[in-house]
């Protein structure tokens, strides 16, 4: 791509641009999903220790989510701000945003590595780790934490490539890392006989290569916004609005940690190991829904943000509705597939007959509200694209903090089958959050567009 791509966002066909930018983003999200899925498959097949090792690595998931959340704080907050600045023709400010966010990511890597490396055993115990699973969680987690700088750079800086219109380059970042991880996993785990440690090393190495790829692009000739050392000194007026906007994504991702612990602790109490195992599968299936949605909205975000900054309001409307209907259509189709083919989805992740039976039952409950997720995600992320940090944050908090997590603990008091009640919390919160978010967005949409004209 070239600088003409940036100009096309203000004049080219909205639908064509959505396809050009959303498809690579969706592919990137799906490939990114393979990181977790492939790791779980390989680790779960380590002779003799596969089950315990897989459980141990799963216990590290809340910390992994927190690291991701901090990356999103800078990346998801800074990229829309940079796009808005580009739309206004203020390239200097946009480049300062890129550099300031990079500085924040480097500082976060130092802090997070220090905190999590030392406290990892204690945290895993709090998450439910046992004497059997704790060693695997700590072994995997400490290696991953030592390489967190690469994870933060990849997840935090890649959005700045997408927001410039280089969706294909952004996708390659993920493809390169995923392919390297898929190749290195069996080599380090089985050939070098390093087990769980090998899986962690493979992941860190793949992220390191992706990080180098990103930095070479952002400091090269093809990029529109160049990462420059002179812009890396933090400026409050530059970085604070980015972090304010990124809080919404930070909350969305970080609350997954709390959510994970809430589900597993409750299901362990009411349903035992098979319920916790089913939850692991359900989480993976749920990612098949949410991650492509994130990709679709990543494709729509630059179009919405750029044209909002350029005050081309009809194009903002067209871009949003294109994003909205694709998201709703995708979740509706997935919802129907889950209802009619629950055992197929369960069987993808496990061959254990008892676990397949239980998961097939649970998946119809847990994902009963999937059709509504497209409404909630597309509207909530559109608020972000329009620079509405406060409203986006409220909508992000609504589903998980205000509805889902409390319902996990409240609903079992009203049902004889308490495990059923825990699973039921998911669709109830999905539908309620979608209704509130959609009504709120369409109520404010016209006001937001009018404000952009002033």
Q: Residue spans of the language-model regions?
A:
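Small-residue-rich hydrophobic transmembrane alpha-helices
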Residues: 54-114, 151-170, 264, 278-336, ...
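N-terminal transmembrane alpha-helices
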Residues: 9-49, 62-77, 81, 106-113, ...
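Short runs within selected transmembrane alpha-helices of multi-pass transporters and secretion channels
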Residues: 144-162, 170-178, 199-212, 294-297, ...
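Transmembrane helical elements of multi-pass membrane transporters/channels
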Residues: 20-39, 143, 177, 206-210, ...
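Interfacial/gating helices of multi-pass transporter permease domains
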Residues: 43-65, 132-136, 196-197, 238-245, ...
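Helix-terminus/linker motif at the lipid-water interface of multi-pass membrane proteins
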Residues: 30, 34-54, 124-131, 187-194, ...
């Amino acid at each position: 791509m070239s600088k003409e791509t940036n100009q096309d966002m203000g004049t080219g066909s909205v639908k064509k641009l959505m396809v050009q930018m959303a498809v690579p983003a969706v592919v990137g999200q799906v490939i990114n999903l393979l990181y977790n899925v492939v790791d779980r498959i390989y680790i779960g097949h380590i002779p003799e220790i596969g089950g315990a090792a897989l459980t141990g690595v799963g216990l590290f998931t809340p910390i992994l989510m927190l690291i991701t959340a901090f990356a999103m704080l800078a990346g998801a907050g800074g990229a829309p701000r940079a796009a808005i600045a580009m739309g206004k023709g203020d390239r200097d400010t946009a480049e300062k945003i890129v550099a300031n966010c990079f500085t924040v990511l480097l500082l976060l890597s130092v802090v997070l590595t220090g905190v999590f490396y030392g406290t990892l055993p204690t945290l895993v115990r709090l998450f439910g780790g046992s004497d059997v699973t704790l060693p695997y969680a700590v072994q995997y987690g400490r290696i991953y934490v030592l390489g967190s700088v690469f994870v933060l750079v990849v997840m935090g800086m890649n959005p700045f490539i997408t927001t410039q219109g280089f969706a294909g380059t952004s996708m390659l970042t993920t493809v390169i890392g995923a392919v390297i991880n898929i190749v290195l996993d069996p080599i380090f785990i089985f050939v070098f006989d390093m087990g769980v440690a090998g899986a962690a090393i493979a992941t860190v190495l793949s992220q390191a290569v992706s990080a180098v790829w990103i930095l070479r692009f952002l400091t090269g000739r093809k990029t529109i916004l160049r990462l420059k050392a002179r812009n890396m000194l933090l400026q409050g007026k530059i970085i604070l609005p980015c972090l304010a906007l990124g809080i919404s994504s930070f909350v969305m991702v970080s609350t997954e940690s709390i959510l994970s612990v809430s589900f597993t602790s409750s299901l362990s109490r009411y349903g035992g190991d098979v319920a916790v195992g089913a939850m692991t599968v359900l989480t993976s299936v749920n990612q098949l829904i949410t991650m492509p949605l994130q990709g679709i909205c990543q494709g729509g975000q630059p179009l919405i943000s750029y044209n909002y900054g350029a005050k081309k309001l009809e194009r903002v409307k067209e871009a949003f509705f294109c994003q909205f209907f694709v998201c709703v259509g995708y979740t509706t189709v997935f919802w129907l597939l889950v209802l009619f083919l629950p055992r197929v989805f369960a069987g993808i992740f496990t061959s254990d007959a008892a676990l397949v039976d239980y998961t097939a039952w649970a998946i119809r409950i847990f994902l009963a509200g999937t059709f509504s997720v497209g409404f909630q995600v597309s509207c909530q992320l559109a608020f972000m694209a329009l620079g509405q940090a406060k409203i986006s944050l409220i909508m992000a908090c609504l589903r998980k903090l205000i509805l889902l997590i409390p319902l996990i603990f409240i609903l079992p008091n009203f049902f004889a089958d308490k495990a059923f009640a825990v699973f039921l919390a998911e669709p109830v919160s999905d539908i309620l959050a979608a209704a509130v978010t959609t009504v709120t967005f369409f109520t404010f949409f016209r006001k937001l567009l009018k404000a952009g004209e002033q």
